[in-house]
Amino acid sequence: IGLFDQDDILHPSVLYAYVKEINEQGADYLYCDETTFKENDINKMLTMHFKPDYAPDNLRANNYICHFSVFSRKLLEGEELFRTAFDGAQDHDMILRLTDRAEKIVHVPRLMYYWRSHEGSTAASIDAKPYAIEAAKGAVADHLKKHGFKHFQITSTRACATIFRIRYQILGDPKISIVIANKDHVEDLKRCITSIQKNSTWSNYE
């Protein structure tokens, strides 16, 4: 199953690239890099989104996968595709749920999805759908609860309202290793250590 918007454009060879990964690696969830463009000219690019490979912590904080998602139908068994509770961020919710179930997630590192930017589209600005931010936080919170996390906080970062900072509850009393890059600057090192000893609220460090 592949999901894309009706007014966007796919690279002519994207299906070939995906089928190749399915045949060679047994991929059951795939995505690629993407670009936004304006008007009807894909050469008028506004942004180019070169994505990392699958990283669950990153995905919780930021729906970097977005387009062009293709996945095995078996991942939907017993699942809803889009949940109305997270309207505006239903793609983030869906991606979190399906990647949880996937056995082989493959990132095709090529610009193969062209996302049309127009008024009223989140490709142009998240301001077009301000409710999407709270919906995305709700989707991430639901995902974290399913993974057993409790007492966490999800806030938007200053960089972008849709990129979140997740503060997790610290479990136990883990030792923190403090590494100070210092060579031949004894006074600077002394000042750093004194500051740590004076101001730190955490006692278990080395």
What are these model-derived regions, one by one?
Residues 141-198:
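N-proximal low-complexity "stem/linker" segments adjacent to membrane-targeting elements
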Residues 55-141:
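Conserved nucleotide-sugar donor-binding catalytic segment
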Residues 204-206:
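Short beta-strand/loop segment that forms part of the nucleotide-sugar
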Residues 9, 13-45:
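Conserved donor NDP-sugar-binding/catalytic core segment of glycosyltransferases
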Residues 31, 35-66, 110:
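Acidic/His-rich active-site region of diverse nucleotide-sugar glycosyltransferases
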